[in-house]
Every structure is written in C-alpha cells, then in structure tokens.
A protein has these predicted regions:
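N-terminal leader/targeting and pre-domain segments
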Residues: 1-15, 92-125
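Short alpha-helical
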Residues: 26, 54-57, 86
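A generic structural signal for short coil/turn motifs at secondary-structure boundaries
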Residues: 26, 59, 79-81
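Non-catalytic, surface beta->alpha helical segment in thiol-disulfide oxidoreductase systems
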Residues: 66, 71-112
C-alpha cells in the first residue's frame, strides 16, 4: 500500500520509501503504478507518495527540479535522497540495496531532506 503523507503510519524501524512527485508531471503519473507494485512486494516497508505542491506544508523547504525524487529513510535517518529513473526495476534494486545494507550510508542531501526524514519517522497528529 502506498500512503499519503497525511495518512502515513508511524514507521519506527521500518524502511520508509517516499516518492516526491507532482500531479502535473507525466513521468510521476507513469511511476505511480510501479511504486504500488514495489509496495505490494515489500509489505515490511512503508511506502508513501507526496505531491510537492499539494503537500508543500509537509515537504517544507525542499527545492525539487526533477521528478520523481525518492527519499529513503529508516528510524528517522536519511539513507537516500535523489532523482530516480521512473522504472520499477531500477527503484526496486535501490530500495533492496538500502534495506539490506549492513550500516546506514550517509546521504548527500539538502538539510531539509534529512529534517523531513526525521519528522516522518515519528507519530503524527
């Protein structure tokens, strides 16, 4: 299941995969079914979809120029932030590699991405 940011469950130690997209973006719309398939195949992870315009108050100061962007985090620690090819196999390999890594890698990303990852790991009102 792919959640919206407004209905995102607490992730705890589960891997969070957040697709940052825009409704007007044709590539994002084409990627959405692939994200659904990835989520169905990985029920132990939390998948979410955010429209950077509709969810601007939650996405915050992220300045996104290319889509889709994947943010992957575990327990509030940002593992990956970057533009992804909108292909299920490519995104799946990235997600699986991050899920099985022995130690979290330091992600090179804007501070706003790390702040969003930390914010989304906890309970929401």
């Amino acid at each position: 299941m792919v959640h919206t940011l407004h209905a995102l469950p607490t992730t705890g130690d589960r891997l969070l995969v957040l697709a940052l997209c825009a409704q007007w973006c044709g590539t994002c719309r084409e990627f959405q079914p692939a994200l659904e398939n990835l989520a169905r195949a990985r029920p132990d992870m939390v998948f979410a979809w955010a429209d950077v315009e509709d969810d601007a108050e939650l996405v915050g100061d992220l300045d996104i120029d290319d889509f889709p962007v994947l943010l992957v985090a575990r327990a509030g620690t940002l593992l990956h932030y970057g533009v992804s090819l909108p292909l299920e196999a490519v995104a799946g390999r990235l997600i699986d590699a991050l899920a099985t890594a022995d130690a979290p890698r330091a992600a090179v990303a804007p501070a706003a991405a790390a702040a969003l990852a930390a914010q989304l790991s906890g309970p929401r009102s």
